[in-house]
Amino acid sequence: DPHRAYEARREERRTSYDYQEHLQNLRLLSAVEGNSEPKPHEIYNAVIMVAYDEGLETLVPSVEAVRDTTFPNERIIFVLGYEERGGEKMEQNARELKEKFKGVFKDFILVKHPDNLKGEIVGKGPNLTYAGEHLAQYVEKKRLRKENVIVTSLDSDNRMSKKYLDYVTYEFCVRPDRQHYAYQPISIFTNNIWEAAAPMRVIAVSNSFFNIISAMRPHLLKNFASHSQPLAALEAMDFWSKRTIVEDGHQYWRSLFYFEGKYEVVPIRVPIYQDAVIAGSTWETLKAQFVQLRRWDYGASDVAYVGTYLFSKERKVPFLQLFPKFMRLLDGHITLAYMAPIVAFGGWVPKLMNASARGAVAFNLPNVVGWIQTFASIGLIITVLVSLGMLPQRPDHVKKKNKFSMVIQWILMPVVAIVYQS
């Protein structure tokens, strides 16, 4: 029984798994008469990579990472969804990519997303949805079963782990209600970490740690950045939102509501590597980092979306299931806004507001906050040590002494947290 085998080993370290071996075991099980499990060799992985105006220096390594996975390339359908507003240069890059990877995958599909379509905002969601609709048409034309096609969405700088598609395919096959699951890898922002400025490196590593910790708490996990879902489920719910800035986190709530609470996100504990923020000048980089974090913070718009549904008469998700999720969503965005300045300055607020305060709280609060900061410093030291092990190999053009800056950069943590996280 593949379900029993899965449950017996789910607590083991998944990074040590040879998922090709597990898929081979599932193939043998699927040959048993009466076994209703999907046959692994009938599963296809479709990868939708969206692009705006990125150059080949960004796009080619990302496609190569998909090519180099351990999953058979003849069962990978690659879709490049690129924006019409990216101009002629993007059009040329798309054609060059298709020519370069001709014959590598089952198919390499180019989908140009038109500009100014009715009912769409300018963003990733409309591009993904437009590409997803074309993918569904392609699958119908090729007479493939949509229930056996797993769709992974990627940004143009995303480079997946070699085991990612095998891992997703295995998790997909062993779940009886597989259409009601999404599969979430760990986003690690280290592709270009050696070239990034110190403040951006601090933010990139901090976000990477947050994603690692999130993967350890599957009951709280939501869609973020790159993720995978079955094509049949995506088509049933009209793919991704075309009206929200943050389409990934919003996809969790859309899926939860559409499937009436029968929806979960499965952690895929292997990385998909992404870029840290780099722009032209230092000022442009600082601004671009702010814009990226602001975009993520637009997930706060889900508070109104979820709250409205929670208290709606049309709600089909059990109240006791949805209410705790709503409160965690609300708490997360509020905490994000105030935590850094409160920890830094909150202990002194009572005395600053009332210099004559003699109460025990006003007197002891600075000491309490000081203890918290001391414990936080210990955690920061651990973070520094672990982050050094996460670094990719130093490029030849980067000097050896720059590794020292990977430690010194953390003195910027308080400033970065206050400026960018509040």
Model-derived regions, located:
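C-terminal catalytic/acceptor-binding lobe
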Residues: 256-339, 346-360, 417
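Membrane-embedded multi-pass helical conduit in multi-pass membrane proteins
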Residues: 1, 328-422
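Loop-to-transmembrane boundary segments
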Residues: 26-59, 121, 314-340, 406-420
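Internal catalytic domains of large membrane-associated glycosyltransferases
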Residues: 2-301
